[in-house]
Amino acid sequence: MTIALGRFTKEEKDLFDIMDDWLRRDRFVFVGWSGLLLFPCAYFALGGWFTGTTFVTSWYTHGLASSYLEGCNFLTAAVSTPANSLAHSLLLLWGPEAQGDFTRWCQLGGLWTFVALHGAFGLIGFMLRQFELARSVQLRPYNAIAFSAPIAVFVSVFLIYPLGQSGWFFAPSFGVAAIFRFILFFQGFHNWTLNPFHMMGVAGVLGAALLCAIHGATVENTLFEDGDGANTFRAFNPTQAEETYSMVTANRFWSQIFGVAFSNKRWLHFFMLFVPVTGLWMSALGVVGLALNLRAYDFVSQEIRAAEDPEFETFYTKNLLLNEGIRAWMAAQDQPHENLIFPEEVLPRGNAL
């Protein structure tokens, strides 16, 4: 029996090879296989958002004006969620709600599901792009892993939370003031700021900002003065092999300041990755819990004592009263489909009235 040793080579390139060559070619803007998902989805998500904020009203879904055409500005314009009566319908243009009528589709809130779903897949495509490029240049995939954190937050807030509620209506609309409204809603109806997952998210984001500031300042403080350029950016060759700052000096400085310091760069930079990513993951988990209407801390003993003793009040019981005010005000204004009517004496009054 004869055994032939050698490498198998194709005589001709098939369609996959041709596409792979073109997609992964070295060009100014890398496309890649991930680009087949990223670029169309990002284009449609951004296009839908610009279209909605420019032309489309929220009168039929929220009883609001929400477009530049109606007089809104960048901070008040939004692509609003569909009405609560449409529940979790995907609101396809050709579906039973719009029946192929583009104007009716926009009026019903179809642009929101369009932007939300294309936006989610666009973010996933961007993460896959980082995986693909890292693999191409033989890097580890920590950039993509880090980017999974904002994806988790987006998916939990815009998709999982409304799926746990009665409809897309309770998701945030895509706009600046609309997001603020959603934050107030979360506080009033879920007491979100007292949720430990929210606390971990805040600690992660603010802790990451602190770490970035400390790290950047420390590197700037310990730069070697071995270049004759006019400033930091001209003094060093970007391809030089040697380091441009002293880790030993930085370690000694922070050891004197805090008594402890990072001993090597790997642990330092992993910690800078770990803090914000873990914080965002935890906050995403908390939002999933809110989708199921899970409650966080309830200090019942303080509530009972405050109810029995008018002179006893804590910041916790005060916040509960504020939350009641938010609910009383927002329920009628924010959910017009419920036709809620509250007596005047229970509604908060302000200078705007």
From Swiss-Prot:
<dbReference type="GO" id="GO:0010242">
    <property type="term" value="F:oxygen evolving activity"/>
</dbReference>
<dbReference type="GO" id="GO:0009523">
    <property type="term" value="C:photosystem II"/>
</dbReference>
<dbReference type="GO" id="GO:0009772">
    <property type="term" value="P:photosynthetic electron transport in photosystem II"/>
</dbReference>
<feature type="binding site">
    <location>
        <position position="215"/>
    </location>
    <ligand>
        <name>Fe cation</name>
    </ligand>
</feature>
<dbReference type="InterPro" id="IPR055266">
    <property type="entry name" value="D1/D2"/>
</dbReference>
<keyword id="KW-0007">Acetylation</keyword>
<keyword id="KW-0813">Transport</keyword>
<feature type="transmembrane region" description="Helical">
    <location>
        <begin position="153"/>
        <end position="166"/>
    </location>
</feature>
<protein>
    <recommendedName>
        <fullName>Photosystem II D2 protein</fullName>
        <ecNumber>1.10.3.9</ecNumber>
    </recommendedName>
</protein>
<dbReference type="GO" id="GO:0016168">
    <property type="term" value="F:chlorophyll binding"/>
</dbReference>
<keyword id="KW-0148">Chlorophyll</keyword>
<comment type="subunit">
    <text>PSII is composed of 1 copy each of membrane proteins PsbA, PsbB, PsbC, PsbD, PsbE, PsbF, PsbH, PsbI, PsbJ, PsbK, PsbL, PsbM, PsbT, PsbX, PsbY, PsbZ, Psb30/Ycf12, at least 3 peripheral proteins of the oxygen-evolving complex and a large number of cofactors. It forms dimeric complexes.</text>
</comment>
<comment type="similarity">
    <text>Belongs to the reaction center PufL/M/PsbA/D family.</text>
</comment>
<dbReference type="InterPro" id="IPR005868">
    <property type="entry name" value="PSII_PsbD/D2"/>
</dbReference>
<keyword id="KW-0479">Metal-binding</keyword>
<feature type="transmembrane region" description="Helical">
    <location>
        <begin position="208"/>
        <end position="228"/>
    </location>
</feature>
<keyword id="KW-0934">Plastid</keyword>
<dbReference type="Pfam" id="PF00124">
    <property type="entry name" value="Photo_RC"/>
</dbReference>
<dbReference type="GO" id="GO:0045156">
    <property type="term" value="F:electron transporter, transferring electrons within the cyclic electron transport pathway of photosynthesis activity"/>
</dbReference>
<feature type="modified residue" description="N-acetylthreonine">
    <location>
        <position position="2"/>
    </location>
</feature>
<feature type="binding site" description="axial binding residue">
    <location>
        <position position="198"/>
    </location>
    <ligand>
        <name>chlorophyll a PD2</name>
    </ligand>
</feature>
<feature type="binding site">
    <location>
        <position position="143"/>
    </location>
    <ligand>
        <name>pheophytin a</name>
    </ligand>
</feature>
<keyword id="KW-0460">Magnesium</keyword>
<feature type="binding site">
    <location>
        <position position="130"/>
    </location>
    <ligand>
        <name>pheophytin a</name>
    </ligand>
</feature>
<keyword id="KW-0472">Membrane</keyword>
<dbReference type="InterPro" id="IPR055265">
    <property type="entry name" value="Photo_RC_L/M_CS"/>
</dbReference>
<dbReference type="GO" id="GO:0005506">
    <property type="term" value="F:iron ion binding"/>
</dbReference>
<feature type="binding site">
    <location>
        <position position="262"/>
    </location>
    <ligand>
        <name>a plastoquinone</name>
    </ligand>
</feature>
<feature type="transmembrane region" description="Helical">
    <location>
        <begin position="41"/>
        <end position="61"/>
    </location>
</feature>
<dbReference type="InterPro" id="IPR000484">
    <property type="entry name" value="Photo_RC_L/M"/>
</dbReference>
<dbReference type="GO" id="GO:0009535">
    <property type="term" value="C:chloroplast thylakoid membrane"/>
</dbReference>
<feature type="transmembrane region" description="Helical">
    <location>
        <begin position="279"/>
        <end position="295"/>
    </location>
</feature>
<keyword id="KW-0812">Transmembrane</keyword>
<dbReference type="InterPro" id="IPR036854">
    <property type="entry name" value="Photo_II_D1/D2_sf"/>
</dbReference>
<keyword id="KW-0408">Iron</keyword>
<keyword id="KW-1133">Transmembrane helix</keyword>
<keyword id="KW-0793">Thylakoid</keyword>
<feature type="binding site">
    <location>
        <position position="269"/>
    </location>
    <ligand>
        <name>Fe cation</name>
    </ligand>
</feature>
<keyword id="KW-0150">Chloroplast</keyword>
<feature type="binding site">
    <location>
        <position position="215"/>
    </location>
    <ligand>
        <name>a plastoquinone</name>
    </ligand>
</feature>
<keyword id="KW-0604">Photosystem II</keyword>
<keyword id="KW-0597">Phosphoprotein</keyword>
